[in-house]
Amino acid sequence: MSAQNLAPPLNTLDFDKKPEETRVVVAMSGGVDSSVVAGLLKQQGYDVLGITLQLYDHGAAVHRAGSCCAGQDIDDARHVCETLGIPHYVLDYEKRFRETVINPFAESYVAGETPIPCVSCNQTVKFADLLATAKELGADALATGHYIRSRPNPSSEHPGRRALFRPADADRDQSYFLFATTQEQIDYLRFPLGGLPKAETRRLAEEMGLVVAKKADSQDICFVPQGKYSDIITKLKPNAALAGEIVHLDGRVLGSHEGILHFTIGQRRGIGIATGEPLYVVYLDARSRRVIVGPKEALETHRVYLRDVNWLGDETLAEAASGEGFACYAKVRSTRAPAPAVLHVDATGTYVDLTIGEAGIAPGQACALYSAPGDDARVFGGGFIERSEREPSAEASLKALLASPVAA
């Protein structure tokens, strides 16, 4: 069945003018999701342009199955556009991607964080540079294959304002990675797959006769060959591979390691020490290159402090979260459902109190905020986790350890 004969998608673009008078740029990664978006919009009669970004060319990474925007993906996107009968363009964003995504990714690991480069890519490349390019091409919208919903916000005092909501397919929910999308970007972006389950997306791809119908989903971090973070970090930041001590929360030196880049908060396997008790990575002390370990209960966190907060509520952040705070739901992991929380803003900063404690929260990760726990919950934005507070005894032990002098 051709794209012209398919039923309309569940999520429309909400424009007042006719589709044939509406130009839409589709960000095409070469995967099934963005390809189906292009096909659905073409079927509805929109003036569709496909754009693929050449983001990197790092040897093995380009040829790795499941990578995004690499050589094969560009070819796949081109074939899809030929099948659909729409123009396709490839833009070289390698330098920009390296400066705004890859280098900060490595720097974050050196600082003892566990970064999310996909958020940075959306912030600085896809929803900034590509969006600007779409506007230069006279497009009315930039459409992507993300699983998230957007629709007009009836509570907004500004006509045309849109809000983000969780998608129909909770297993494919990408709202966690899109918390940093600004209001201006949301108003211009469209997400036609927000109301579709993934299985339906693949079915549509087969009906359209697209070469990517059975293509595997892309991996989260596209530029890391075979998932070996340490290789690219060591290449860009050799200091991250410097040896250091593995220290217990109680101050005992238990062993040594070959670089904090090999560890993340909450890790148990592969620490490299045998003590007869289960120990977990509790903190990465980048300044003194110490990996601090402790029992599982030392990981439990009820409060996280945020930086670079992107607030998408109807009131200002200060109005909403001062005083008793803003009751909401929070996700500190992409795979978890939103859980009850309270957002606060005061003299100490912006922080979220989690009603149910979470274990192994790492700085550099995200905390996304929602109106409710279920699908179609509104996305209120979020921020990057700057630090977390553990249960009192573990927090006291950690502060004492960090304040103590380190042997030369």
UniProtKB/Swiss-Prot annotation:
Q: From the UniProt record, give one GO term of the biological process aspect.
A: tRNA wobble position uridine thiolation
Key word Ribosomal protein present:
no
Carries keyword RNA-binding? yes
Q: Which keywords does the record carry? A: ATP-binding, Cytoplasm, Disulfide bond, Nucleotide-binding, RNA-binding, Transferase, tRNA processing, tRNA-binding
The annotated active site, in chain numbering, is: 121, 222
For the site Interaction with tRNA, which positions are given?
A: 146, 365
Q: Name one GO cellular component term.
A: cytoplasm
Q: Give the main location.
A: cytoplasm
Where along the chain is ATP bound?
27-34, 53, 145
Q: What class of enzyme is it?
A: transferase
Q: Which family does it belong to?
A: Belongs to the MnmA/TRMU family.
Question: Do you know which PANTHER family this protein is assigned to?
Answer: MITOCHONDRIAL TRNA-SPECIFIC 2-THIOURIDYLASE 1, TRNA 5-METHYLAMINOMETHYL-2-THIOURIDYLATE -METHYLTRANSFERASE
Protein name listed in UniProt: tRNA-specific 2-thiouridylase MnmA
